[in-house]
């Protein structure tokens, strides 16, 4: 109460004069040009101060006389302060009396206006227990066609008095707790309102927190269809059949398909689609399935199933190969190496989900087989031939044994070195393809003439054969040791198309290199 009476009068002389009920000083200020609706830092006007003040001395006039004079000088009774209260609300709060309330109502004060807490002058009149003021307010509402249907006053759990008002709209039975929700009502049928709607006509001061939507006809519960009933909104009748289902699916996550069932169905479909794969490819598929449990569904590329089956048949006729652990590890653990593929598969595309997974798995197998074919065609040690090529392999193995033998190398004969170089050139594939590995071996331009070594990093697919005689003289004289040197980088513009990669060394190659260094060194 003391907080309501507290008034700030330092910044405005008119407010100070009204607060002290100095009628003559107020008249002089208004005639001198003071603004009658000027407010203080709380947004309170002189009319509000006149309704709140309780200052009485020998020079002050009555509250009714001061308010009447202010209203005659065009004071606005419907201005709201920073808390949303009007002069009529302040009059009801401070028990200004029925005469003051009548003056305000006659000057156009609106009894249905509400403050920021949702209370109107009617609520404050009920809480102040002023029957005469309440009767005047009810009569004013009836005169304006706003008949008050119900005003209830209860005590909350904390002991405070709470008042509800309903203007022009009869209260719904659901608000008073007479109706209970249907037994088949799901949580998605309950609408939760967290903030009150903006009040335009002040027809309701308090609404329900939970609003039960109209249930389906199968449940046997029908909401009120009255235009003013708060249990039904007009726009809900125009909603289609799919929208409520989608809203219920998003609001009730327990209705969705569990991820374990999707994963189980995915594994079964993969097993049905890929029955003729090799054990190494089956290992890579199992590693991919482990990655599916931690990531979204991934897609490598788009390919038709018919094309994939055709490619698989082509590679099966050409001959099966065995994958190395590095290839399986790089293709299964690091599927993000391809930047052009889409990252995730949307869950909304459920009809094409299993089809896309099987296609991506087939494509990954085809891609690994294609990579292996290129790998074996570029490596002279890993190339396998069938038919008449087997005889050439046996001859090359015999010549390799001759090379490892120290006798022809110690003699330094020109014929043995030339025979070895010719044999190596016959086995060399002219379509040079690089491979990647873990070791870094620097080779000179003569390295590609020796068997058992990887192809050099040259741009020209048909490199010129250097003169072997010069190096044979160096070997026979023994003045220089055969040390591998870094290849010269060509300066042709075509070199941009080649990707320089490192070579890998096997134990057999390391032994050959050590034998050569012992012999020539």
Curated annotation (Swiss-Prot):
Region listing for Disordered, in residue ranges: 161-188
Subcellular localization, as worded in the UniProt entry: Cytoplasm; Nucleus
Gene Ontology CC entries for this record: cytoplasm; nucleus
Segments of skewed composition (Polar residues): 177-188
UniProt keyword annotation of Cytoplasm present: yes
Alphabetically ordered keywords of this record: ANK repeat, Cytoplasm, Nucleus, Repeat
Name used for this protein in its record: Ankyrin repeat domain-containing protein 34B
Source organism of the structure: Xenopus laevis
């Amino acid at each position: 109460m003391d907080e309501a009476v507290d008034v700030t009068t330092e910044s405005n002389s008119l407010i100070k004069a009204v607060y002290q009920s100095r009628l003559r000083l107020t008249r002089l200020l208004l005639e001198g040009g003071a603004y009658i609706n000027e407010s203080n830092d709380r947004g309170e006007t002189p009319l509000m101060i006149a309704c709140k003040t309780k200052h009485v001395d020998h020079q002050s006039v009555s509250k009714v006389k001061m308010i009447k004079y202010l209203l005659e000088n065009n004071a606005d009774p419907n201005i709201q302060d920073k808390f949303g209260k009007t002069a009529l609300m302040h009059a009801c709060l401070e028990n200004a009396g029925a005469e003051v309330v009548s003056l305000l109502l006659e000057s156009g004060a609106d009894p249905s206006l509400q403050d920021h807490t949702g209370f109107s002058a009617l609520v404050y009149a009920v809480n102040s227990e002023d029957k005469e003021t309440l009767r005047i307010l009810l009569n004013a509402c009836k005169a304006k066609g706003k008949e008050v249907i119900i005003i209830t006053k209860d005590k909350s759990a904390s002991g405070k008095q709470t008042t509800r008002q309903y203007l022009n709209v009869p209260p719904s039975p659901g608000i008073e707790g007479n109706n209970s929700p249907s037994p088949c009502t799901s949580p998605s049928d309950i609408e939760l309102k967290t903030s009150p709607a903006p009040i335009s006509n002040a027809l309701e001061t308090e609404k329900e927190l939970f609003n039960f939507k109209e249930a389906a006809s199968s449940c046997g519960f029908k909401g009120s269809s009255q235009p003013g009933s708060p249990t039904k909104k007009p726009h809900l009748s125009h909603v289609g059949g799919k929208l409520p289902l989608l809203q219920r699916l998003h609001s009730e996550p327990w209705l969705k398909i569990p991820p374990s069932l999707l994963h189980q169905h995915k594994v079964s479909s993969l097993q049905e689609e890929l029955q003729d794969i090799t054990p190494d490819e089956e290992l890579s598929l199992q590693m991919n399935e482990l990655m599916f449990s931690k990531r979204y569904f991934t897609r490598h590329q788009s390919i038709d199933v018919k094309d994939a089956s055709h490619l698989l048949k082509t590679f099966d006729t050409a001959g099966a190969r065995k994958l190395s652990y590095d290839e399986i590890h790089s293709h299964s653990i690091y599927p993000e190496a391809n930047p052009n593929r889409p990252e995730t598969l949307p869950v909304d595309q459920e009809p094409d989900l299993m089809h896309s997974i099987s296609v991506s798995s087939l494509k990954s197998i085809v891609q690994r087989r294609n990579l292996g074919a290129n790998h074996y065609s570029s490596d002279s040690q890993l190339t396998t031939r069938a038919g008449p090529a087997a005889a050439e392999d046996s001859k090359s193995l015999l010549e390799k044994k001759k090379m490892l033998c120290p006798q022809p190398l110690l003699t330094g004969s020109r014929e043995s070195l030339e025979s070895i170089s010719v044999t190596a050139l016959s086995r060399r594939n002219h379509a040079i393809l690089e491979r990647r590995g873990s070791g870094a071996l620097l080779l000179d331009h003569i390295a590609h003439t020796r068997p058992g070594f990887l192809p050099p990093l040259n741009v020209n697919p048909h490199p010129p054969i250097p003169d072997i005689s010069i190096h044979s003289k160096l070997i026979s004289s023994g003045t220089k040791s055969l040390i591998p040197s870094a290849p010269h980088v060509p300066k042709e513009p075509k070199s941009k198309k080649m990707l320089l990669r490192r070579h890998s060394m096997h134990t057999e190659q390391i032994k050959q290199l050590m034998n050569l260094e012992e012999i020539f060194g």
